[in-house]
């Protein structure tokens, strides 16, 4: 046994690294394990949290590798012993071949915008007596950002909502039309987490743009 981050393998070609690394907070340890293995591996085959499907995580992985396989692992029945409540997938990443001139071909980072001309994300309102933020004023509707009902839209009673659990939307045009469009989107992407479903601002912008801005 030894610390994996201290391990350097023999100088041989075509090394395959197989494992189920610890996840860490927001998948941070799994990313570190991947990037250490990437220094000398040809192929990396890991069981990882489903957050590894998200652009924000893939942008942190060694750019010399490309994803070639992804299989979702069941949560019910749990495939782990002992059982654990974590949403995982099995991914295979392969080192990208060098170009004709011998220079490495790198995967490119994906930059997702966090704003859209059709609406404005409103910041939270002022904090209350307990130090928690209050709902902002002026929002046309809110979209649930966390939990099993991720993507739900609330139009009425906004002042009763917990601000941190929602995205607060101010339409720059027709609010009813925009809310209706958001209501047709497929939010299953929010399940690509280790535990609680979530969808961020960049996810919302990307989902909306890919659905409506390409038509």
Task: List PLM regions with ranges.
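Class I S-adenosyl-L-methionine-dependent methyltransferase catalytic core
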Residues: 1-215
